[in-house]
Amino acid sequence: MKLKGKGIGKVVVEGEVIVSRKPLSFLGGVDPETGTITDPESDIKGESITGKILVFPKGKGSTVGSYILYALSKNGKGPKAIIVEEAEPIVTAGAIISGIPLITNVDISKLKTGMRVRINPQEGEVEILAEGNL
């Protein structure tokens, strides 16, 4: 199955998905040294986003969140890619300065943690390759 959205980036990426059904703040919500979700309100608290394709509905919080995303990337703890239903400026800027491929305007209800997907930002496509841990 392929989902269509809008993409930022040029690199086709394949990997395991980690899905949050709640908005995410990178400032105070993710540890930039470990890549672990620290937000006590998050449905994926304690999980690592390192090397995974991070899926969430939208960002929230401070503009500093863009720099936390950059720090995650510089520390080798960032996500491999981001899929977000609604990409607001914080997440968009963070993905751009970090070189993290991003797909937005996608119905994330079709995605579940553990799925394997391929994203093609130039085409704005998310292709589900394997169902994973349902």
From Swiss-Prot:
Offer one Pfam family short name for this entry. AcnX_swivel_put
List its EC numbers: 4.2.1.182
What one GO molecular function would you report for this record? hydro-lyase activity
> Under which main EC class is this enzyme filed?
lyase
Q: Where are the catalytic residues? A: S62 (proton acceptor)
What does the entry give for GO biological process?
isopentenyl diphosphate biosynthetic process, mevalonate pathway
Which reactions does this protein catalyse? (R)-5-phosphomevalonate = (2E)-3-methyl-5-phosphooxypent-2-enoate + H2O
Check the record and name the InterPro entries matching this protein.
PMDh-S-like, PMDh-S-like_dom, PMDh_S
Q: Identify the domain of life.
A: Archaea
Keywords, in A-Z order: Isoprene biosynthesis, Lyase
Signal peptide limits = none
Pathway membership: Isoprenoid biosynthesis; isopentenyl diphosphate biosynthesis via mevalonate pathway
> Quaternary structure?
Heterodimer composed of a large subunit (PMDh-L) and a small subunit (PMDh-S).
Q: What does this protein do?
A: Component of a hydro-lyase that catalyzes the dehydration of mevalonate 5-phosphate (MVA5P) to form trans-anhydromevalonate 5-phosphate (tAHMP). Involved in the archaeal mevalonate (MVA) pathway, which provides fundamental precursors for isoprenoid biosynthesis, such as isopentenyl diphosphate (IPP) and dimethylallyl diphosphate (DMAPP).
PANTHER family, alphabetized: DUF521 DOMAIN PROTEIN (AFU_ORTHOLOGUE AFUA_6G00490)
Question: What's the family?
Answer: Belongs to the AcnX type II small subunit family.
Protein name as it appears in the record: Phosphomevalonate dehydratase small subunit
> What's the source species' lineage?
Archaea, Methanobacteriati, Methanobacteriota, Thermococci, Thermococcales
